[in-house]
Amino acid sequence: MARLNGTRAVVGGLAATAVMTVLMLMAPAMGLPPMNIGAMLGSVMGGSVFLGWMAHFVIGTVLAIIYAAVFATRLPGPGFLRGALYGLVPWIVAQLVVMPMMGAGPFGGSFGAGFGSLMGHLVYGAVLGGIYGTTEAQAAARPAHAHV
């Protein structure tokens, strides 16, 4: 079993969260409902959009560490595919637990919101898996003396 690389997990989580964030902020340009995650999370944190964005990136990083520790070596396929499959886990939790807690109903109350969120989480997972999986494979391929 491969050992968890915390640095790669954190870097992958931050990068994946950033890419997902950009995609979701661009949702209206793609005909999907607006998805301002910072404002949405901030609404349950005293209205602070800044705290909402901080929470979003912390959650993305924690989810990346969970991926690296539990799922990265247990899912089939290349890193980006393993990550995309993993992206389904937080998407389902968000749609069935988080969205109703925020008053939006399951799947954000509409097909567009649920679909947009699905795309965001799949991209998050693919980026995470690509970063974590690729570097893991590269690290495994290096001879031990290359670290000198």
Question: Language-model segments: which ranges?
Answer:
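Juxtamembrane/disordered regions of integral membrane proteins
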Residues: 1-148
